[in-house]
């Protein structure tokens, strides 16, 4: 069942439960963003600055370096805890990611929630919610948490499958309204908590099919995110990683915290 350990390291010794739907921090309960989040990557810190508790998107087409950038952030970012949600990825890619990041020092403060592409749509959608809930639980303990969700596009695909099965008519390129609303609700759950003093910084990868930056999922995510990092295929083909397109990327809070 969902929530069970799959790493062969024994049972999870949890004594508390947290709802998959989470406890979204209301706008009036969020503390102001005042500190820069240190991603550990100079180009991101300098060119696409974002703060602790912000929601940031990584937008790119297939094979442009999203996974490379995500690996770099997991290894270099400064946070009390890191939660990675791998949703709808191939089982081999999930296995490779776990092998790379759960054998070294990062394993002590990193949790991975994985629901590969061969699982049912409802499990893939629940996996994204569980990863977010775990990050929320750690935030409620006063920790500064980094949530990385890969990817919002796969989450939207799962929500679209469920919506179509329930008879909901498709709208933008076949996505029913509930599918796009689902990713919006996931993003809104990140932020700083005034009550606990904890923070949850969200980084969400978005697959731009065919490098189309006007894809419905890209548009929906961009509208609510506090900033986004666009990866360029042209820059990647020159062998420059991370292939950040500075002109297309955006930090909406740079003036406030720098």
Predicted regions and their residues:
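Short, glycine/charged-enriched hinge/interface segments at domain edges or termini
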Residues: 1-75
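P-loop NTPase catalytic core
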Residues: 46-49, 53-257
């Amino acid at each position: 069942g969902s929530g069970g350990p799959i790493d062969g390291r024994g049972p999870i010794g949890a004594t508390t439960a947290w709802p998959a739907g989470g406890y979204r921090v209301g706008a009036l309960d969020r503390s102001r963003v005042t500190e820069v989040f240190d991603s550990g990557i100079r180009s991101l810190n300098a060119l696409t600055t974002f703060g602790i508790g912000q929601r940031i998107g990584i937008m790119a087409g297939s094979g442009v370096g999203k996974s490379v950038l995500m690996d770099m952030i997991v290894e270099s970012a400064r946070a009390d805890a890191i939660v990675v949600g791998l949703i709808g990825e191939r089982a081999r890619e999930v296995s490779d990611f776990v092998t790379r990041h759960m054998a070294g020092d990062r394993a002590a403060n990193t949790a991975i929630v994985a629901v590969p592409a061969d699982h049912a749509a409802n499990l893939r959608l629940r996996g994204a919610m569980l990863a977010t809930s775990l990050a929320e639980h750690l935030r409620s303990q006063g920790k500064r948490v980094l949530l990385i969700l890969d990817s919002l596009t796969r989450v939207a695909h799962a929500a679209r499958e469920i919506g179509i099965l329930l008879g909901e008519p498709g709208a933008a390129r076949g996505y029913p309204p509930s599918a796009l609303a689902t990713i919006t609700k996931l993003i809104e759950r990140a932020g700083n908590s005034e009550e606990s003093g904890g923070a949850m910084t969200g980084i969400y990868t978005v697959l731009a099919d065919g490098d189309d930056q006007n894809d419905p999922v890209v548009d929906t995510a961009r509208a609510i995110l506090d900033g986004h990092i666009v990866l360029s295929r042209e820059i990647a083909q020159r062998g420059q990683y991370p292939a950040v397109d500075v002109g297309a990327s955006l930090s909406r809070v740079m003036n406030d915290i720098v």
